[in-house]
Swiss-Prot record:
Biological processes per GO annotation: 1-deoxy-D-xylulose 5-phosphate biosynthetic process; isopentenyl diphosphate biosynthetic process, methylerythritol 4-phosphate pathway; terpenoid biosynthetic process; thiamine biosynthetic process
Naturally occurring in which organism (per UniProt): Mycobacterium sp. (strain KMS)
Binding site for thiamine diphosphate: 71, 112-114, 145-146, 173, 284, 365
Protein name, entry field: 1-deoxy-D-xylulose-5-phosphate synthase
Pfam families on file: DXP_synthase_N, Transket_pyr, Transketolase_C
Names of the cofactor(s): Mg(2+); thiamine diphosphate
SMART domains linked to this entry: Transket_pyr
Listed EC numbers: 2.2.1.7
Binding annotation for Mg(2+): 144, 173
Family: Belongs to the transketolase family. DXPS subfamily.
Cofactor note: Binds 1 Mg(2+) ion per subunit.
Keywords from the UniProt entry: Isoprene biosynthesis, Magnesium, Metal-binding, Thiamine biosynthesis, Thiamine pyrophosphate, Transferase
Length: 638
């Protein structure tokens, strides 16, 4: 049956039994396809019936469907003609793991960061009103923890202020990555269905207000009494007191019930909340039984067991997790904060070991940062573990609430640099540029697991400024020993006997391994290279200017955007120190990258050992540091 669905129109003629059969097919399709490619399995298994109902009730793309935390949009993609592309999910030139405007007219926003959908919906509804398109509904699907983010409530406050047709579907599965926390999560759990409430209220309003002379006065009196009773007995007043209609809660796995609720909501032509209760991982036992994350996201897995087909090598996240626990055992002032991601950021083990020193604040990065400031003011040392891409959301709080007060807060930025398959929204290629403008900020970029542990310890010893440790997604690899350490900077390689000090190659973090390969390739061409790892990359260590002065060319290699990155900072430091040595930088161009593997993205932008070797050869030849012709040497490098 799924093969016959080319678009939402193909759903309209289906009976309830056919819809139930189709839902089963969709789940089996998702399980087998995502098992082969990796992706967000649990969230999509939970929204099958909901997505079917949405496309039967609303006319997409005439009525925009906006999925908050867009990893819930796989079923939406299937129902809008993209089922045949799922073998390429999250692969280069393949199907995106999130809504994508370039894929389909049914995808309105490239949504993947949480809590933004309601603001998009508010803006679209206003635009439709101003341009005379009053017959268009805007539907925002929120949930998977998104309502723990403050941006949702800012949007709700605005949406409720006008009578525009915005339908807000709360997909209440009680979770984001981990179980959703906080007062709002408790509030949703308390809600109960009140059949006929809105119909009776509307009929009563018309009848009482229709009374001559005293009608409006009587209505206001009755409304006040009703509001008082409702406040005492009915927990959905959080929504209704904002001026939002409320429908629910509805069994999110009963397609007929969800469809009926959505049709009811559509008829209001006003802002309305439809509360749908779903189960993350529905229909797949390994996901339902995964109490930690209900298979929120997975790699390639065995369908029968739900287990990964390959044993994962030690990763950066687990290395951080182990180190933090060790430091936490020695120091009771160390506390940890996550924004709804204890597992992905490596804090689950710390939570289990030190539950009273662990705080999950929900999807609320701004609050996390300022709460950390308060903890630091109280004499503790907070460690805020967060994906690099989500740091952008808390920049003002970092600047004004933490750095301005010179507070000892340590940021641990996971998934820094190019992450790959999750695409533009999840690459952490801005953090060095952002952190570089924060006064007093100190940033470390460990090259391996040993340095991660070491630099984390050094960060925890800082008591007069914020610090950050950044590392990428993936395997941590083997430790890379230093030849020597000079004033805090590790020297990883020096020119071989007989070669001059031609190039100082400054490697940022894990790019140290690539830099060593580049140095060896250049050595074979008679170019002497010194490879250094600054360890603490911001502010630029003063000793780097001394290293630079002893070489003919400085080259920086970093997993960050070139604008405002370490290359820019090193160049500025050389100018300030009046060291007149040319400086070239290798990094990421200032653009958004489509989804692909990390290696594919880096290759596309020329950040490979071969290409860097060719570039440096040309630069050295242009400086006259070697008599070899640049083109000739480049050919030999190939």
């Amino acid at each position: 049956m799924l093969e016959q669905i080319r678009g939402p129109a193909d759903l309209q003629h289906l009976s309830q039994s056919a819809l139930s059969e189709l839902a089963g097919e969709i789940r089996q399709f998702l399980i087998h396809k995502v098992a082969a490619t990796g992706g967000h399995l649990g969230p999509n298994l939970g929204v099958v019936e909901l997505t079917l109902a949405l496309h039967r009730v609303f006319d997409s793309p005439h009525d925009p469907l906006i999925f908050d935390t867009g990893h819930q949009a796989y079923v939406h993609k299937m129902l809008t003609g993209r089922s045949h592309e799922f073998d390429s999910l999250r692969k280069k030139d393949g199907l995106s793991g999130y809504p994508s405007r370039s894929e389909s007219e049914h995808d309105w926003v490239e949504s993947s960061h949480a809590s933004a959908a309601l603001s998009y919906a508010d803006g679209l509804a206003k635009a439709f009103e101003l341009t005379g398109h009053r017959n268009r509904h805007v539907v925002a699907v929120v949930g998977d923890g998104a309502l723990t983010g403050g941006m949702c409530w800012e949007a709700l406050n605005n949406i409720a202020a006008a009578r525009r047709p915005v339908v807000i579907v709360v997909n209440d599965n009680g979770r984001s990555y981990a179980p959703t926390i906080g007062g709002f999560a408790d509030h949703l759990a308390a809600l109960r269905l009140q059949p006929g409430y809105e119909r009776v209220l509307e009929e009563g309003r018309k009848a009482v207000r229709g009374l001559p002379v005293i009608g409006e006065f009587c209505y206001q009196c009755m409304h006040s009494v009703k509001a008082g009773i409702k406040d005492a007995l009915s927990p959905q007043v959080m929504f209704t007191d904002l001026g939002l209609k409320y429908v629910g809660p509805i069994d999110g796995h009963d397609e007929h019930a969800v469809e009926s609720a959505l049709r009811h909501a559509r008829g209001f032509n006003a802002p309305v909340i439809v509360h749908v209760v779903t189960r993350k991982g529905m229909g797949y036992a390994p996901a339902e039984n995964d109490e930690a994350e209900q298979m929120h996201a997975c790699g390639v897995i065995d369908v029968a067991t739900g287990r990964a087909t390959k044993v994962a090598a030690p990763g950066w996240t687990s290395s951080f997790s182990e180190a933090l626990i060790d430091y936490g055992a020695k120091r009771r002032d160390i506390v940890a904060i996550t924004a709804a991601m204890p597992g992905p950021t490596g804090l689950s083990a710390f939570r289990d070991r030190f539950p009273d020193r662990f705080f999950d604040v929900g999807i609320a990065e701004q609050h996390a940062m300022t709460s950390a400031a308060g903890l630091a003011m109280g004499g503790l040392h907070p460690v805020v573990a967060i994906y690099s891409t989500f740091l952008n959301r808390a920049f003002d709080q970092l600047m004004m609430d933490v750095a301005l007060h010179k507070l000892p807060v340590t940021l641990v930025l996971d998934r820094s640099g190019v992450t790959g398959p999750d695409g533009a929204s999840h690459n952490g290629m801005w953090d060095l540029s952002v952190l570089g403008i924060v006064p007093g900020m100190r940033v470390a970029a460990p090259r391996d697991g040993a340095r991660l542990r070491e630099e984390l310890g050094e960060a925890l010893d800082v008591n007069d400024a914020p610090t950050a440790i950044r590392f990428p997604k993936g395997d941590v690899g083997e430790d890379i020993p230093a030849v020597r350490r000079h004033r805090g900077v590790d020297v990883l390689a020096e020119p071989a006997d007989g070669l001059s000090d031609d190039v100082l190659l400054v490697a940022v973090g894990p790019f140290a391994s690539m830099a060593l390969t580049v140095a060896e390739r250049l050595r074979k061409q008679g170019i002497g290279v010194t490879v250094v790892d600054p360890r603490w990359v911001l502010p630029v260590p003063e000793v780097l200017t001394e290293f630079a002065a002893a070489h003919k060319l400085v080259v920086t290699v970093e997993d960050n955007g070139l604008h405002g990155g370490i290359g820019s900072s090193v160049s500025a430091a050389l100018r300030h120190a009046e060291v007149d040595v040319p400086c070239r930088d290798v990094g990421l161009p200032q653009q958004f990258f489509d989804h692909a593997s990390r290696g594919e993205v880096l290759a596309d932008v020329g950040v490979t050992d071969r290409n860097i070797s060719r570039q440096i050869t040309g630069w050295v030849a242009a400086l006259g540091a070697t008599p070899a012709d640049a083109d000739e040497v480049s050919e030999r490098l190939d």
